[in-house]
């Protein structure tokens, strides 16, 4: 599956399973990633084996309320420019819509991390530990079932989400 076919008009949240990423950032070894828009260059986002991508559909003027609707696991980076070998694409049933994403706001609005302006470039954003834990706890415990979407992805198993994941958002 090509990266552009996967993303379309979604925003992508990467659940990185390697907690050592925090140590790299704190030590200054990891400052930023060179993530350029694929339509401008041949460079692609750098995902690793076992990374879990959460696909979030932002609110658009002529579209229904936003939702977090799909989960896919990264198998490997391909040697060509086609992107990544991905596991099966799971549809979240039901999708997590606006009314189910009020877990961090008493005012009845979406969490700020979901409302940022889309500047049409890749950016790296690290959530705070509290945001990360709250977000993952909600997503994984919101009585959401995962169903394989026919014709998408590869094998029938997905990489499990780690106990201490790091979430990084890539805005498209």
Q: Which residues does each predicted region cover?
A:
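Sparse, context-dependent recognition of short Cys/His-centered cofactor- or disulfide-binding micro-motifs
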Residues: 32, 38, 53, 57-59, ...
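Compositionally biased, charged N-terminal/linker segments
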Residues: 1-49, 126, 132-172
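Short coil-to-beta transition motif at edge beta-strands of beta-rich domains
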Residues: 43-61
């Amino acid at each position: 599956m090509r990266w552009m076919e996967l993303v379309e008009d979604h925003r992508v949240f990467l659940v990185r399973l390697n907690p050592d990423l925090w140590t790299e950032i704190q030590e200054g070894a990891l400052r930023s990633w060179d993530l350029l828009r694929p339509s401008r260059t041949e460079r692609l986002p750098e995902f690793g084996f076992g990374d879990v991508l959460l696909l979030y559909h932002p609110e658009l003027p002529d579209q229904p309320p936003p939702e977090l609707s799909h989960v896919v696991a990264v198998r490997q980076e391909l040697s060509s420019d086609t992107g990544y070998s991905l596991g099966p694409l799971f549809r979240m049933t039901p999708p997590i819509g606006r009314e189910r994403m009020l877990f961090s706001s008493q005012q009845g609005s979406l969490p700020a991390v979901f409302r940022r302006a889309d500047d049409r470039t890749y950016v790296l954003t690290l959530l705070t530990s509290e945001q990360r834990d709250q977000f993952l706890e909600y997503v994984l415990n919101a009585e959401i079932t995962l169903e394989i979407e026919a014709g998408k992805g590869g094998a029938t198993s997905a990489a499990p989400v780690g106990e201490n994941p790091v979430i990084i958002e890539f805005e498209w």
